C-alpha cells in the first residue's frame, strides 16, 4: 500500500506520520496537495479544544493538483489545478435544496470530521472542488477559504453607504475590511484590542450602522452593542470555543439585530482573489514543511497577523522556490 506523510492527531498526540494514500470513492477526486494554509481552528483541533474525529489528518485550507478520479467523476481531469471548499454539504437539507450548500448546517469539514489537507494527498467529493484560475498561485488558491468566510458578512442586511466598524487586529479583520471596501463600503473603520486606536479612548456610543465582530468574546460583543446605533446590526463572525454571555438588556433597549454569518460563495471568493490579488498579498506569510508544524502552530496561537502555509513535498526551501515548483504542476499555470 502506497504511503504518504501527514500531520496526524491521535488522542493527545500530534505528529508527522506515514499513513496510507487514500483512494477516491465514488464521486471523489484524489488531490496532490501543493499548499495548505494554517488556521487558528486547525490549532484548536490539534489541542483538542474542538470536537473532531480521532485519529485525524488535520488541515482544511488548501490547493493542489488532481492526481486521480473515481470513474463516475466528470468535468475534471488529472493535472487540473484546483482549490476546495472544505465544508462537505449533506445535500439533504433545505439550504442544500436551495443551492446554498456553503450554508449547510449539517456539513462535515475536512480536517475535523474527515481527513484533511496537511498531507501529501487528500480525497474530496468532486462537488466541492473548484478549478483555479490560471492567474492565481497555489498560495492564493489556498487562501480562497478564508476569503469565502469573509464574504459571509455580505449576507447581512447592510448596504453602502452604511457606516461600519470591523473589530479585530488580526488578518481576519483586515481581510473582512478589504472585502467590504471592494463591495463599495467606503465609510468603514477598523479597530481592535491592542491597537493604538483602542488605547486612545472609547468609541462614542451609537456611532455605527453596523459592526462586524470577528472575535466573539463577551467583552467584544458588549462593546459592539454599545457603539452600534439603535436599530443597527452586530454581525458575528468566528466560532467561540465556549458559550458567550451577552448584554441582552442593552441590545433589546436599542433594538439591535444580532446576525451570525458563516460563508459566502466559493465562486465569489475566487473572483475576489483574481480582482484583488494585490490587496491580500500582505496577509500571506511563509511556506513551511510539515515537519515544522510545532513552530507554525505556536506562532499561529500567539499572532494571527500573517497566514502561514505548509508545502507537504518540500522542507527548508524558500517560498519563491515552492511557488515556482507549484506553478509547474498544472497546465493552467
Predicted regions and their residues:
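C-terminal hydrophobic helical "lid"/dimerization subdomain
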Residues: 2, 267-333
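Glycine-rich beta-strand-centered segment in the early N-terminal region that forms part
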Residues: 20-36, 49-94, 133-135
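A short acidic, Gly/Pro-enriched loop at the edge of an enzyme's catalytic core
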Residues: 27, 201-211
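Glycine-centered, small-residue-biased loops immediately flanking beta-strands
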Residues: 232-233
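Rossmann-fold NAD(P)-binding glycine/threonine-rich loop
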Residues: 238-256, 268
